[in-house]
C-alpha cells in the first residue's frame, strides 16, 4: 500500500499553535464509519453521541517536563537533554543536542548542581544512556528544572504547562500528550458519567516516535516505535463486560486505541490486566478486536495515525473528511479540534 495514498494538502495556518482558552470550546467533526456521513458540531455535543452503557477509555499518562538544559562540568558548554525512556535505577535513554559533545564519561550539571548526569553509553540510533545523580525525589527535581517538550510543529511558547496535560493525567512517563483527551474538563466528564457512560483508563507512555514521519514508500515496510502500556483490572472488567453484552467501547485517542487492540488481539478479543511494550501498527486491512469508536484529533499527512483512523473508518471516508476539515478550517494537530468516528 502506497504511503502517498494518505497524503493531503494542509495549509500551515491551520496548525494550531495555542490551546483554546476553554478546553471544551473546540469543534467536533463526526464521521459515521458505515455511511461516510459527516456532521460539523462543537465538542460539547460529544455527549449527544454517547449512550448509557458505553465505555469511554482514556489514557491517563502524564507528560514529563522532559527537556533539560545543562552545562558540561569540564568546559561549561551548553547541553540540551531530552528524556525518552526510563531504564530504571536512575538510568534514562535520552536525546542530546549537540550529541558530539556528549561522549561516554561526560558529566552534565543542571540547576546549580541540583541535578547531575553522567553519559554511560551511545545507542544504535545516536541517543545517549545517562545516569542521574541527585538528592531528594527525582520527579520533583524534574518538575523544577525541566520544561515541556512540545511537538516540532508548535513554534509558540506554552504559557501554562498544564494545558499540555489532560485533566485526568496521573501516571508520569510520556514525552508527548495523548492529545485527544485535552478537550475534556472535569465537569464535562462528570456530565458524561451522569448519562450512564462508564469511564475507564489505560496507561500508554507516548514516545517521540509518534512524531516520526513514515520514511518507507510502502505502508507495510514501516517499522513502528515501541511504547510502554498498562491495563488495570478495573478497566478489563468494564470493557470485557461491555463486549459480552454488545455495548460500545470508544477510545479517547489513538494511544488508548493501540493499547486496547494490542491486548485484545493477543487474547481472542478480550482484555487481561497486563503491562508491556507495544509496537502495534494499525492500517487499512486491520480487523479491530475491541474498538467500536474513536475520538481523536486531526493528524499529520502520511502519518501512522491517519492510517489508523483509515483502518477504522475506511480510507476514502477519512480522506474525504480531512478534505472537508481543511475546507471548513478546522484546527489541526495537538492543540486542534476533534474528530469522532462511530
UniProtKB/Swiss-Prot annotation:
- Any one Pfam family here would be Queuosine_synth
Domain of life according to the entry = Bacteria
Q: Which GO terms describe its molecular function?
A: S-adenosylmethionine:tRNA ribosyltransferase-isomerase activity
Places the protein is found? Cytoplasm
Q: In terms of one coarse class, where is the protein primarily found?
A: cytoplasm
Pathway, per UniProt? tRNA modification; tRNA-queuosine biosynthesis
| InterPro entries in alphabetical order | QueA (IPR003699), QueA_dom1 (IPR042118), QueA_dom2 (IPR042119), QueA_sf (IPR036100)
**SS bonds (residue pairs):** none
Which reaction(s) does its UniProt entry say it catalyses?
Answer: 7-aminomethyl-7-carbaguanosine(34) in tRNA + S-adenosyl-L-methionine = epoxyqueuosine(34) in tRNA + adenine + L-methionine + 2 H(+)
What are the protein's UniProt keywords? Cytoplasm, Queuosine biosynthesis, S-adenosyl-L-methionine, Transferase
- What are the annotated GO cellular component locations? cytoplasm
Gene Ontology biological process terms in this record: queuosine biosynthetic process; tRNA wobble guanine modification
Identify the EC number(s): 2.4.99.17
In its keyword annotation, does this UniProt entry include Cell cycle?
A: no
Q: Do you know which Gene3D superfamilies this protein is assigned to?
A: QueA-like
Would the keyword S-adenosyl-L-methionine turn up in this protein's UniProt record? yes
* Signal peptide positions (record): none
Function description? Transfers and isomerizes the ribose moiety from AdoMet to the 7-aminomethyl group of 7-deazaguanine (preQ1-tRNA) to give epoxyqueuosine (oQ-tRNA).
Q: Which family does it belong to?
A: Belongs to the QueA family.
**Assembly and oligomerization:** Monomer.
In terms of HAMAP family, this protein maps to: QueA
Q: Please identify the protein, giving its name as recorded.
A: S-adenosylmethionine:tRNA ribosyltransferase-isomerase
Gene designation per UniProt: queA
Amino acid at each position: 500500500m502506497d504511503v502517498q495514498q494518505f497524503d493531503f494538502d494542509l495549509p500551515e495556518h491551520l496548525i494550531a499553535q495555542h490551546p483554546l482558552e476553554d478546553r471544551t470550546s473546540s469543534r467536533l467533526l463526526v464521521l459515521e464509519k458505515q455511511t461516510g456521513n459527516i456532521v460539523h458540531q462543537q465538542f460539547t455535543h460529544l455527549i449527544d453521541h454517547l449512550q448509557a452503557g458505553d465505555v469511554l477509555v482514556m489514557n491517563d499518562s502524564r507528560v514529563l517536563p522532559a527537556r533539560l538544559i545543562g552545562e558540561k562540568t569540564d568546559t561549561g558548554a551548553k547541553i540540551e537533554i531530552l528524556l525518552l525512556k526510563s531504564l530504571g535505577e536512575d538510568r534514562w535513554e535520552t536525546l542530546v543536542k549537540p550529541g558530539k559533545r556528549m561522549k561516554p564519561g561526560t558529566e552534565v550539571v543542571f540547576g546549580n548542581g541540583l541535578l547531575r548526569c553522567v553519559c554511560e553509553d551511545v545507542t544504535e540510533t545516536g541517543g545517549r544512556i545517562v545516569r542521574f545523580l541527585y538528592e531528594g525525589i527525582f520527579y520533583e527535581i524534574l518538575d523544577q528544572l525541566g520544561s515541556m517538550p512540545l511537538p516540532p510543529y508548535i513554534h509558540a511558547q506554552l504559557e501554562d504547562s498544564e494545558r499540555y496535560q489532560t485533566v485526568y493525567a496521573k501516571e508520569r512517563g510520556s514525552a508527548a500528550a495523548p492529545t485527544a483527551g485535552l478537550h475534556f474538563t472535569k465537569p464535562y466528564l462528570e456530565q458524561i458519567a451522569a448519562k450512564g457512560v462508564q469511564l475507564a483508563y489505560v496507561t500508554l507512555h507516548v514516545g517521540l516516535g509518534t512524531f516520526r514521519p513514515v520514511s518507507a514508500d510502502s505502508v507495510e515496510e514501516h517499522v513502528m516505535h515501541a511504547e510502554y502500556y498498562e491495563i488495570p483490572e478495573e478497566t478489563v472488567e468494564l470493557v470485557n463486560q461491555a463486549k459480552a453484552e454488545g455495548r460500545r467501547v470508544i477510545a479517547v485517542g489513538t494511544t488508548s486505541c493501540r493499547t486496547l487492540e494490542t491486548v485484545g488481539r493477543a487474547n481472542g478479543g478480550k482484555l487481561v490486566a497486563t503491562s508491556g511494550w507495544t509496537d502495534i501498527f494499525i492500517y487499512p486491512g486491520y480487523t479491530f478486536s475491541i474498538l467500536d469508536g474513536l475520538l481523536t484529533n486531526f493528524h499529520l499527512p502520511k502519518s501512522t495515525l491517519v492510517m489508523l483512523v483509515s483502518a477504522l473508518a475506511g480510507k476514502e471516508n477519512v480522506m474525504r473528511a480531512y478534505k472537508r476539515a481543511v475546507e471548513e478550517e478546522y484546527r489541526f494537530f495537538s492543540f486542534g479540534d476533534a474528530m469522532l468516528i462511530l
